[in-house]
Structures are given as structure tokens and as C-alpha cells.
Design a protein with these regions (language model features):
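Transmembrane helices and adjacent periplasmic/lumenal helix-loop junctions
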Residues: 189-207, 316-323
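Primarily membrane-embedded glycan-assembly and transfer machineries that use lipid-linked glycans
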Residues: 1-177, 182-183, 208-328, 332-339, ...
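Central hydrophobic cores of alpha-helical transmembrane segments
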Residues: 188-189, 221-227, 304-310, 347-359
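Membrane-embedded alpha-helical segments of transport systems
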Residues: 194-198, 227-232, 349-350
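Charged/polar, low-hydrophobicity segments characteristic of intrinsically disordered regions
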Residues: 131, 206-209, 242-249, 357-376
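Aromatic-enriched
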Residues: 333-411
């Protein structure tokens, strides 16, 4: 390449990327302007806007009321089960939402949707790299299509859910951990606690694994990240933890706070005791797998991390369909192990499997959309199906000496 072409490419590529990003925002803005503002992003934008523009706490009741007026055109009727649209995130999350609060709502929503779309693709790319798996061109295209077209991803984008960004933070964090970039991995995993119920499982597992694997620097950087977020946010607003807890209490009578396990227990008439018993059983089994993962081996670490992700999606509160985008990691691990075992011959079956999974997620969710209630079969069924898939590939994923040996014949 000549020096002139080198200079042109150095400038042209960033310009093209910026042009593509601007086009994506414009397309998303057209969608936002045609769609009602009944999405989760409304409450987060109101919180960021009030804090950055008016210096009003995002937990102030007036901020929730503004979000309710934007969504319902009136105050929420909690007796009907309407979401009070509280900010409901830890104060450090303002590092994401405050800059968006500087933009008018429609533009901010379009920018946020664009960021989430990029996050979904980027997290898929990182997971594939972490698993050392590269499919054929057709398989890659099918996988990228699945990334944004199955129902949890669609709902995450339309509602402006943080789960897509959470997927990227976790993917980047684990990628850095395996590359032994302790500072980057620790800080990214600390940032994953911006949505605590989604990040806590993997953060606890990585901390446990790092302690017993001699990765003290990783633990130190993770603790530093958590301490910085907590300390700086408490300096800005010492009372925010109690204000957030009060907002959580406002959801106690609403179905949205239930975990998938709690929904199952409720439907079976087992009540809170059933929820605690099922959750305790799942956690006990998970802890047993955590103990077996000690030793620092990459294959067992990744498989256990994927299992942790799937199990925690069953037991954490505020179980919503959008959170299931985090299942992409265990799904990729399952398909990757299958692919490594049988080679390119699995292309067609794997693509059919992804198509069936995407179709099922839509078919099972369509009826629930009219009732504004998540599908029980999607919320509970998909994580359970994923756990079954992980158990199916457990031997290949944890006993082979290298990922490349997954294709070796069984003895």
C-alpha cells in the first residue's frame, strides 16, 4: 500500500464508521418517532435528564411522575399493576444515562437503541473469540441474525433495556480475564454491577475462581472498581442507597419484581417457601460446580461461567424477557462444543436449531404482548433448556485438554 493510500485509509475508515453510526441513529429515530414512549428507557432518561439539567435526584418522586406522564399521560395506577417507572438503578448508572439526558428524548432513545444494537453484535463477536470458535460464513451470518432477531434481543432494543449493554460488559470482562489483563477485566466486571441482578452471578463466580486460582490482582482491581463507584456516588448523594431501596419496595406488590422461579412456584401454588426451596437447590448445585471449576483451567471456567449465567437468570428478581439476551453466551458455548465435536457437518443442524429457538421465542411471546405480561414459557423455559444443553456438552466442554480436542473420539 502506497503512503497516500495509507493516509486515505487512516482517515476514510473512521469517517465511514461515523457515517454508518449516524445512519443507524437516523433509522432508529424514525422508529422511535412512530412508536409510543412506553419503554423502560423513559424512566432512565428522565432520571438522567433531571440530574444533569436540574440537579434533581433521579430517585425523587417528581422524576417518576414525569416518566409516568410521558408513558401513561397521567400518574401510574399501581392498583392495576402499572409500572411506577422509578429510576431503580444504582446512582453510578448515571455515567451512562446522564449524557443521554442532555439530548431531547426521541434523539436520546434513538442513540441508545443504536448503542444497544452495536453492543449485541460486539458481545457475540467477543464470546466467539473467547470460546476460540469460528464458524463458516453461513453459520456466522445465521448467528449474527439470531443475535438481534430472537425475541429477547428485539424486546431489549425496543424497550431500551440495559441488558444488551450488560452483555457487552460481561463479554469484555471475561475476555480480559482470560487474557490476564487484570486491571481491564476487574474494572469491566465492576461496571457490570450497574445492573446488579444481571452482573452479580458472574462477578461472584469470577471472584471465587480468582481467589483460589491465585489471581489476586484481578480481585484487587475488581474491588477497586466497586469501591470507586460506591465511594464517588456516595460523595455525590449520600442518601441514594436508601432512596433506591424505597423504590424497590414500591415494586413488591407487582408481578414484574418476581423471578422466573417465583413465577413457577406461584403457578404451582407453592408460594414463597417453594421459591426459596427451588432457588436454594439451584444455588447448591451451582456452588458444587463452582468448587469443581477451581484449578484455573479455561474450559471448565467458561462452562461454569455459562452455567452461572443461566441459573442466575432463573432466580434473580425483576425477571423479564429482555434479560435473556445474556443466554447468548451459554448458547454459543453449546453450539461451539457441538461444532468442535462434529465439524462443518453441524452447520445445517445448528442453523436450524437457532432458527427454531428464535421462532419459538417469538411464538411463545406473541400472546403475552397483548396482556403486557412476559411469557412464562420463555422466562423459565429458555434458561432451563439452556441448562439442559450445557449439561449435554458438559463432558466435551470440561474434559478435553483443549477446545481443538473437542472433535477427538470418545473413549
Amino acid at each position: 500500500m502506497t503512503p497516500i493510500l495509507r493516509v486515505w485509509s487512516r482517515w476514510l475508515i473512521p469517517v465511514l464508521l461515523l457515517a454508518l453510526a449516524a445512519a443507524l441513529v437516523m433509522v432508529n429515530r424514525s422508529f422511535v418517532e412512530a412508536a409510543p414512549a412506553r419503554n423502560d428507557f423513559t424512566a432512565r432518561w428522565e432520571g438522567g435528564h433531571s440530574w444533569i439539567s436540574e440537579r434533581v435526584s433521579p430517585y425523587d418522586p417528581s422524576v417518576s411522575l414525569q416518566a409516568q406522564e410521558r408513558v401513561y399521560g397521567r400518574p401510574a395506577n399501581e392498583r392495576r399493576g402499572e409500572d411506577p417507572l422509578h429510576f431503580l438503578y444504582p446512582l453510578p448508572a448515571l455515567i451512562i444515562f446522564a449524557p443521554l439526558g442532555l439530548l431531547e428524548f426521541e434523539l436520546a432513545h434513538a442513540v441508545w437503541m443504536s448503542v444497544l444494537e452495536i453492543c449485541l453484535f460486539a458481545s457475540t463477536w467477543l464470546w466467539c473469540g473467547t470460546l476460540h470458535w469460528k464458524g463458516s460464513g453461513w453459520m456466522t451470518a445465521a448467528l449474527l441474525g439470531f443475535t438481534v432477531m430472537w425475541f429477547p434481543a428485539f424486546e431489549s432494543l425496543v424497550l431500551g433495556q440495559f441488558a444488551a449493554l450488560e452483555a457487552l460488559l460481561l463479554a469484555a470482562g471475561l475476555t480480559a480475564v482470560l487474557a490476564r489483563r487484570e486491571s481491564v477485566g476487574g474494572l469491566l466486571l465492576a461496571a457490570a454491577l450497574l445492573k446488579p441482578q444481571l452482573g452479580i452471578g458472574l462477578v461472584l463466580f469470577v471472584t471465587w475462581w480468582a481467589i483460589f486460582s491465585g489471581r489476586r490482582q484481578l480481585v484487587g482491581w475488581l474491588a477497586t472498581g466497586v469501591a470507586l463507584m460506591a465511594g464517588l456516588s456516595l460523595l455525590l448523594d449520600p442518601g441514594w442507597p436508601m432512596q433506591m431501596i424505597r423504590q424497590v419496595f414500591d415494586y413488591l406488590g407487582l408481578a414484574v419484581i418476581l423471578s422466573p422461579v417465583a413465577r413457577v412456584s406461584e403457578s404451582l401454588g407453592l408460594g414463597q417457601a417453594g421459591t426459596l426451596a427451588i432457588s436454594a437447590f439451584l444455588l447448591a448445585y451451582l456452588f458444587w460446580e463452582w468448587k469443581g471449576s477451581l484449578g484455573g483451567e479455561e474450559r471448565r471456567f467458561l462452562w461454569t461461567a455459562a452455567l452461572t449465567q443461566a441459573i442466575f437468570l432463573l432466580i434473580v428478581p425483576f425477571g423479564i424477557v429482555s434479560n435473556l439476551v445474556l443466554l447468548l453466551f451459554p448458547i454459543l458455548l453449546i453450539v461451539g462444543a457441538w461444532y468442535g465435536r462434529l465439524g462443518r457437518s453441524v452447520d445445517a443442524p445448528a442453523m436450524v436449531l437457532l432458527a427454531l429457538l428464535a421462532s419459538a421465542s417469538w411464538l411463545l411471546s406473541i400472546g403475552s404482548l397483548e396482556q403486557s405480561e412476559p411469557s412464562f414459557w420463555v422466562l423459565f423455559g429458555l434458561p432451563l433448556l439452556t441448562i439442559g444443553g450445557l449439561l449435554w456438552v458438559r463432558w466435551w466442554s470440561t474434559r478435553a485438554q483443549a477446545w481443538s480436542e473437542l472433535g477427538a473420539p470418545l473413549l
